[in-house]
From Swiss-Prot:
Completely overlaps YRF1-1. One of its GO terms (cellular component) is membrane. It is a multi-pass membrane protein. This is Putative UPF0479 protein YDR545C-A.
Amino acid sequence: MPAKLQLDVLRTLQSSARHGTQTLKNSNFLERFHKDRIVFCLPFFPALFLVPVQKVLQHLCLRFTQVAPYFIIQLFDLPSRHAENLAPLLASCRIQYTNCFSSSSNGQVPSIISLYLRVDLSPFYAKIFQISYRVPMIWLDVFQVFFVFLVISQHSLHS
């Protein structure tokens, strides 16, 4: 891919992230080139609760239609409910997606590790949360514990 086109694509990714939501203010929003692929990561919790995924993807598709032959966009950790609803949109722009939490059996997780050679998955996610979302990991832990407690208490009330 020509260097100028690479730069244009990276700028597009950055503007797409900002276009999607004000929580993505960091201009280095986890976009990486790897051979013929662009990797665009949406961590599970923020993607589920904070990021309007459809807006981001529509913006990406509009901006990338002309250069689609040069690359494949890969989305990691796209929640399944978004993936199902957006399947035609994803296919139209050659966007592939996978969910880290359910893909260990088909070899997708090592492909993430190969892109980020010096981090395993835990620091990788910590870095996503802290840099892209400015949310300290401890608060995410507290939220998860509270959420699990809420689900358990609701379940026990109904039984």
